[in-house]
């Protein structure tokens, strides 16, 4: 049985082959498997952790292709659902010169939105050690109820719960709906990863310390705020710190946050009980975030999300050399 289970969307990213152009100007697109929770599952598997993915794909060529990608990377798909009622989600991605992205999603609806609460396999989740989910599937029913049901099962069975509220305003009817939807998963989590932009959006303040104060809750043991190439800042009960990033040549930042989160979970995994009880010291947390920064940086050096996720050897090499 997998030690880590991730839940949510998986899709096909069509990434512009040329940077610095709009979607309309792009001469061609390269197919790349992605979807934040699936990226985390593959990212952890490449680092050597046993993982499984739950959610729903279209019973179509793209859905079966995505299943094969997961399996080729060692991710268990035994509880993956398929439907003929909707297609597998697609996203078209244009890249700025610095590797940052703009998205156009095709989900009207997509299969991941139709994942239903009765399809959540309770024993499968209950036997794991870590459960990770994101916010994209919280935007529509029945996917939202299924995702939250899975998170509830995880919490009730003592799993360590990780959450990634992913800000994609185009997927919500309004900014307020996005804020409310993203916060629906907040209280379930022991670990949360957000960007500076997401922290400001959810809290309403650009003062990071104030934002963290406002967003903190009793179950939370670690909040990691990513800051792009600058690195990340972490907050834990009685501890906090900034950890600088690694300078690499960024080609495509798609999946960088997911690689960061996979790296963070990998680093913390042997000490989850100590983290839960507040027993990790500041230096141990810094080392975990440094590993996560290295994984995130490496993911920007290749196009696509899953194709760019690094191996343990690649992360260790960057940690050792700094370049």
Which residues does each PLM region occupy?
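Conserved N-terminal subdomain of the carbohydrate kinase-like
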Residues: 50-135, 317-323
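Glycine-rich phosphate/adenosyl-contacting loop at the front of the ribokinase-like
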Residues: 1-76, 115
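Glycine-rich phosphate/pyrophosphate-binding beta-alpha loops
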Residues: 89, 135-139, 296, 302-305
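Conserved phosphate-binding/catalytic region of the ribokinase-like
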Residues: 2-5, 152-153, 204-323
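Conserved beta-alpha-beta core of the PfkB/ribokinase-like small-molecule kinase fold
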Residues: 130, 136-214, 220-222, 230-231
């Amino acid at each position: 049985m997998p030690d880590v289970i991730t839940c949510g969307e998986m899709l096909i990213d069509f990434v512009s082959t040329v940077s610095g152009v709009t979607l309309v100007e792009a001469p061609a697109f390269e197919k790349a498997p992605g979807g934040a929770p699936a990226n985390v599952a593959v990212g952890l598997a490449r680092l050597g952790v046993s993982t499984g993915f739950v959610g729903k794909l279209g019973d179509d060529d793209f859905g079966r292709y995505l299943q094969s990608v997961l399996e080729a990377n060692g991710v268990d798909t035994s509880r993956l659902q398929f439907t003929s009622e909707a297609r597998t989600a697609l996203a078209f991605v244009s890249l700025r010169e610095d590797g940052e992205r703009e998205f156009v999603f095709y989900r009207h609806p997509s299969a991941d939105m139709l994942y239903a609460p009765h399809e959540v396999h309770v024993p499968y989740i209950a036997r794991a050690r870590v459960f990770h989910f994101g916010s994209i599937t919280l935007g529509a029913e029945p996917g939202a109820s299924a995702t939250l049901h899975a998170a509830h099962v995880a919490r009730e069975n003592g799993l360590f719960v990780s959450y990634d509220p992913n800000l994609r305003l185009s997927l919500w009817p309004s900014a307020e709906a996005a804020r409310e939807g993203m916060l629906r998963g907040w209280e379930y989590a022991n670990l949360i990863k957000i960007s500076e932009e997401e922290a400001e959006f959810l809290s309403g303040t650009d003062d990071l310390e104030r934002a963290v104060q406002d967003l903190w809750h009793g179950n939370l043991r670690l909040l990691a705020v990513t800051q792009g190439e600058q690195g990340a800042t972490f907050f834990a009960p009685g501890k906090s710190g900034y950890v600088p990033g690694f300078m690499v040549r960024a080609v495509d930042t798609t999946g960088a946050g997911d690689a960061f989160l996979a790296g963070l979970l990998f680093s913390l995994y042997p000490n989850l009980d100590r983290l839960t009880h507040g027993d990790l010291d500041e230096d141990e947390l810094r080392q975990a975030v440094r590993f996560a920064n290295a994984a995130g940086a490496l993911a920007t050096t290749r196009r696509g999300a899953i194709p760019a996720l690094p191996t343990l050897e690649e992360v260790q090499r960057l940690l050792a050399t700094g370049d």
